[in-house]
Amino acid sequence: MKILIMRLELRAEWVNSLKEKRMIVLSLTKRLSNKFNVSVSEVNYQDVHEKIGIGIVSVGTTKEVLYSLKEKIIDFVEDNTDAELIKIEEEIIDY
């Protein structure tokens, strides 16, 4: 069993309030969870309205499957939000 752990950091300079940011984060996390069957949560910057930190976890049978999933998730985030993806951290763990 392999476990993919990702942390994405996004910058959304046009966001003016935490309420507006939370609407964006909620929409993005729900769409990621539904489309890719992954666990998603806002993990950083809850009190900073211009930055978004999202954690994503998935389990797979091979590293290749998880690397493919990672690329699809990154493409989806870049295509479905106006926020700039500024940092990607990822790790695949053998369990």
Regions found by a protein language model. Name each.
Residues 38-43, 86-89:
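A short linear hydrophobic-aromatic micro-motif
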Residues 3-4, 41-61, 93-95:
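Short, charge-patterned binding micro-sites
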Residues 61-95:
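C-terminal structural segments of small proteins and small subunits
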